[in-house]
């Protein structure tokens, strides 16, 4: 009985000791967690699960302490913490994170030739965290095995714990609170996973996910990352949906669809599917064979040289879009024969190309243009509808006795002659040629998204949920380029059996339906024994470059696209291991030389002295398009280019005492072409109207303007030799590694991208600094360049509008200047295609609010980089921002004249200027001869080429 109090005392002591031990353990855990999280970036690089089985997710963002010469005393501590990148508070943590592979850690020795000043302690080059970007995928950022990555925008992804810098600076209670808040946000769908980055990674100062939750704005997120919540958003319908829309994919689609009609269609489709009224559950198989039939065809290069007694006739269906009319005409010229038939569908958004194709159809009786047009978006159900309607049209043309259906695009080109193709198909006239995926069907279905429901509207493919593959059939698929015989086309078009009817319904709600519909129908039809697993084509797949998810703005999925062929690929066309007759893709604005090589290989060289063989012209604006098709930026600059040409005419052609070569501009530009020579962009060709002051008559002229070289290696050159080129622009094409905005035409509301091209060498980190026209440092960030990186690109999230004028982007290594490039942000003379008003000009041309391109100031870097901000320069910029009319045009033209040169000018018709050359007699004008693309009379052998 006496032991009880002792036992109670021991229990109390044990309880107290246990609480103390738990407290100590908790504190130790928090301390260890704090320090270990500081190096999470390196830990993630050393291992961890990769996203989708590919490369690892992006390392935790980190900053490297850079060796920067110290600022003068006047600059130290100024600029609102600009020199310290946020006013301090990051020093030990940022240094502890260190660098990536090959990236120096801690303090670096000062390099010889560095900027002349003392070392500035604690400065870290900065990439801000206020805006989240998904378009900064640098070179090699896509997993090597892209097929192991989930293609969906919506499927959950796993990622290693990232370092959260704001937590490392808070006490434990605040850390727990922040963690709890982050978890709640992730549960609500605010979290967003970014694809992993490899070489060329931009090194930011803070976690991107943290930036998304604390600073991100809805407009800066990708559409699929916007908050959707747990229930349907407030959506207006003409008629309320017949069910509760609860699926996250459908809710996301409803929140992003722009038109009321599209939202209505999404709701109706989702409900029909939810009620089991949309998709077939079971389909009848009519193929008498078990398994997959695959006929082998013999390939003998010599046997196809002899024309058969009853040669097949081919219906070529050309599905084209864009503005590359000359490339299309060159391809048409190569495939044309009087015995075949050509049915051309032009995307309903490509009116210029449609006008050009109509002119071609008037020249040849065996060429017709579809009287209907669809918007054939990438991956859309409309492409299958286009093929099926084209097949019906062709079968109803009783005067066209064709035997084979072949689909082509303007990016295709033949790699063997028409005679070879006809001889081969005549030998196998009962076969159908389609390329299968070559994988197990379950994997193909998953990667192709066949088990997902899609709907096309508003020129977008919306993912609405999951679905089941119908029972009873084998699903197949592969390439959407094929050769089908007439008998099978008749079956697909006119059959009302269970297979065809239900497959048309199933594939009406399928992503990339043309890549699977014909395969699946053929394999399960009575014609299954006619399938040849070869579509007779070579496609230039480079998944490292082509699988950049570049179509996510069009489809709720991640797809791939083939690359353009280059001259080094020519040997692939000469293989004879299997029958191939066409190749894709070719694009003359990327490389025309390979098209010429192939054309000469098939049909021989043009006669010596033939003009235009190395030139390429592509229209980007035509007067019938209307100026509403132009942006304010392009309209502004096209006008300035025209005035630049008139000044050239006055200075180089005008003689004193007469006005015969002096002009006054009239109206808007009539047309604009891109001009390339030997696969190098040479500038713009502006066709415009002007009044000749000597005779007061209107003349039509064409001006050639060329951009000046703006990339410059530092002088004296640094020891760092990896950088080969740098450029700034918009519309970066990561697949072809070029800017699609040729010439880099930028305005105040554009978001420029900085690109660098690298040679091989050791791993390095470089610093990139963006400077505006009055020497305000707008952005600075580091980029890790691994030894194998070839290109890097990054879009700094600058606050808009950008200040008009000439900007400079400087590249430094160890704070030693390596190179710089410049780009022009043009002030706008038009707003909504009307002359800009004073209040609009002041709003657009005065730079961002408080001169703050980012959350933090970099003012203290100006003296370090020898970039003084001149009060007179700032005052002049302020006056320029308020200018309109002729004063604004004068400011614009002075800027344009500093970045562009008027190379030449010519007259398209009669002119009063006696020394003005005629455009058709020049080598550069869009009116000059172009025999490789010109279509003439049919030759005796039935061909055009």
Swiss-Prot record:
Its EC number is 2.4.2.26. Keywords: Disulfide bond, Glycoprotein, Glycosyltransferase, Golgi apparatus, Membrane, Metal-binding, Signal-anchor, Transferase, Transmembrane, Transmembrane helix. It is found in: Golgi apparatus membrane. Residues 42-245, 926-945 are annotated as: Disordered. It comes from Pan troglodytes (Chimpanzee). Pathway: Glycan metabolism; chondroitin sulfate biosynthesis; Glycan metabolism; heparan sulfate biosynthesis. UDP-alpha-D-xylose binds at residues 319, 347, 376-378, 480-481, 561, 584-585. Catalyzes the first step in the biosynthesis of chondroitin sulfate and dermatan sulfate proteoglycans, such as DCN. Transfers D-xylose from UDP-D-xylose to specific serine residues of the core protein. Required for normal maturation of chondrocytes during bone development, normal onset of ossification and normal embryonic and postnatal skeleton development, especially of the long bones. This is Xylosyltransferase 1. Disulfide bonds join 243-271, 287-528, 547-560, 549-558, 661-913, 906-919. One of its GO terms (cellular component) is extracellular space. Residues 39-945 are lumenal. InterPro entries: Glyco_trans_14 (IPR003406), XYLT (IPR043538), XylT_C (IPR024448). It catalyses: UDP-alpha-D-xylose + L-seryl-[protein] = 3-O-(beta-D-xylosyl)-L-seryl-[protein] + UDP + H(+). The lineage of its organism: Eukaryota, Metazoa, Chordata, Craniata, Vertebrata. One of its GO terms (biological process) is ossification involved in bone maturation. Pfam families: Branch, Xylo_C. Belongs to the glycosyltransferase 14 family. XylT subfamily. Its cofactor is a divalent metal cation. Glycans are attached at residues 212, 407, 763.
């Amino acid at each position: 009985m006496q032991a009880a109090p002792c036992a109670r005392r021991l229990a109390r002591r044990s309880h107290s000791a246990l609480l103390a031990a738990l407290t100590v353990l908790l504190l130790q855990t928090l301390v260890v967690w704090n320090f270990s999280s500081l190096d999470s970036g390196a830990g993630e690089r050393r291992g961890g699960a990769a996203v989708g089985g590919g490369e690892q997710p992006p390392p935790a963002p980190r900053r490297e302490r850079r060796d920067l010469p110290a600022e003068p005393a006047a600059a130290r501590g100024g600029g609102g913490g600009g020199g310290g990148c946020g006013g301090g508070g990051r020093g030990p943590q940022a240094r502890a994170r260190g660098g990536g592979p090959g990236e120096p850690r801690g303090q670096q020795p000062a390099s010889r030739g560095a900027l002349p000043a003392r070392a500035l302690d604690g400065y870290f080059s900065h990439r801000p965290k206020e805006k989240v970007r998904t378009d900064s995928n640098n070179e090699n950022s896509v997993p090597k095995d892209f097929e192991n990555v989930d293609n969906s925008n919506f499927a959950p992804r796993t990622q290693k714990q990232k370092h959260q810098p704001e937590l490392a600076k808070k006490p434990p209670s605040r850390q727990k609170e922040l963690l709890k808040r982050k978890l709640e946000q992730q549960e609500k769908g605010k979290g967003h996973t970014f694809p992993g980055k490899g070489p060329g990674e931009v090194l930011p100062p803070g976690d991107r996910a943290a930036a998304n939750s604390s600073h991100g704005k809805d407009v800066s997120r990708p559409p699929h990352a916007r908050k959707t919540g747990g229930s349907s958003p407030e959506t207006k319908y003409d008629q309320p949906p017949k069910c509760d829309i609860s699926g996250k994919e459908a809710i996301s689609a409803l929140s992003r669809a722009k038109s009321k009609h599209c939202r209505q269609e999404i709701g109706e489709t989702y409900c029909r599917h939810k009620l089991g009224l949309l998709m077939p559950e079971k389909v009848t198989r009519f193929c008498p064979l078990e398994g997959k039939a695959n006929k082998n065809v013999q390939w003998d290069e010599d046997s196809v040289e002899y024309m058969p007694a009853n040669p097949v006739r081919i219906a070529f269906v050309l599905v084209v879009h864009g503005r590359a009319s000359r490339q299309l005409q060159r391809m048409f010229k190569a495939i044309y024969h009087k015995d075949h038939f050509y049915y051309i569908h032009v995307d309903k958004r490509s009116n210029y190309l449609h006008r050009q194709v109509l002119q071609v159809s008037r020249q040849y009786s065996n060429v017709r243009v579809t009287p209907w047009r669809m918007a054939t978006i990438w991956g859309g159900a409309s492409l299958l509808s286009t093929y099926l309607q084209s097949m019906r049209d062709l079968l109803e043309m009783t005067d066209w006795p064709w035997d084979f259906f072949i689909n082509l695009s303007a990016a295709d080109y033949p790699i063997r002659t028409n005679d070879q193709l006809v001889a081969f198909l005549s030998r196998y006239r009962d076969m159908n040629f389609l390329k299968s995926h070559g994988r197990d069907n379950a994997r193909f279905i998953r990667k192709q998204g066949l088990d997902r429901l899609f709907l096309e509207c508003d020129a977008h493919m919306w993912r609405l949920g999951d679905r089941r593959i119908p029972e009873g059939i084998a699903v197949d698929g592969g390439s959407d380029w094929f050769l089908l015989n007439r008998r099978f086309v008749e079956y697909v078009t006119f059959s009302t059996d269970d297979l065809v009817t239900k497959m048309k319904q199933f594939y009406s709600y399928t992503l990339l339906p043309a890549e699977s519909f014909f395969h699946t129908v053929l394999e399960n039809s009575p014609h299954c024994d006619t399938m040849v697993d070869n579509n007779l084509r070579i496609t230039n797949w480079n998944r490292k470059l082509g699988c950049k998810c570049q179509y996510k703005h069009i489809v709720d999925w991640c797809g791939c696209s083939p690359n353009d062929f280059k001259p080094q690929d020519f040997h692939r066309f000469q293989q004879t291991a299997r029958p191939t007759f066409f190749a894709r893709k070719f694009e003359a604005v990327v490389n025309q030389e390979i098209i010429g090589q192939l054309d000469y290989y098939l049909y021989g060289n043009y006669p010596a002295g033939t003009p235009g063989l190395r030139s390429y012209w592509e229209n980007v604006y035509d007067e019938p398009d209307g100026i509403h098709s132009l942006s304010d930026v392009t309209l502004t600059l096209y006008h300035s280019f025209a005035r630049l040409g008139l000044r050239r005419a006055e200075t180089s052609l005008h003689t004193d005492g007469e006005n015969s070569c002096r002009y006054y501009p009239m109206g808007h530009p009539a047309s604009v072409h891109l001009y390339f020579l030997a696969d190098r962009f040479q500038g713009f060709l502006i066709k415009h109207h002007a009044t000749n002051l000597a005779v007061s008559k209107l003349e039509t002229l064409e001006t050639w303007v060329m951009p000046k070289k703006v990339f410059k290696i530092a002088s004296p050159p640094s020891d760092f030799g990896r950088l080969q080129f740098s450029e700034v622009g918009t519309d970066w094409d990561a697949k072809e590694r070029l800017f699609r905005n040729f010439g880099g035409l930028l305005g105040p509301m554009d978001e420029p991208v900085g690109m660098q091209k690298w040679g091989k060498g050791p791993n390095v980190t470089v610093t990139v600094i963006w400077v505006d026209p009055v020497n305000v440092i707008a952005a600075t960030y580091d980029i890790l360049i691994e030894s194998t990186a070839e290109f890097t690109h990054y879009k700094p999230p600058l606050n808009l509008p950008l200040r008009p004028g000439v900007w400079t982007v400087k590249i430094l290594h160890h704070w030693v200047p390596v190179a710089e490039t410049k780009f022009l942000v043009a002030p706008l003379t038009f707003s909504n295609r009307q002359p800009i008003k004073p209040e609009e000009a002041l709003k657009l041309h005065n730079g961002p609010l408080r001169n703050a391109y980012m959350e933090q100031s970099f003012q203290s870097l100006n003296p370090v980089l020898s970039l003084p901000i001149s009060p007179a320069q700032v005052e002049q910029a302020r006056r320029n921002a308020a200018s309109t009319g002729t004063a604004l045009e004068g400011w614009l033209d002075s800027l344009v004249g500093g970045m562009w040169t008027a190379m030449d000018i010519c007259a398209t018709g009669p002119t009063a200027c006696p020394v003005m050359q005629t455009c058709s007699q020049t080598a550069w004008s869009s009116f000059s001869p172009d025999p490789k693309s010109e279509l003439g009379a049919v030759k005796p052998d039935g061909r055009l080429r």
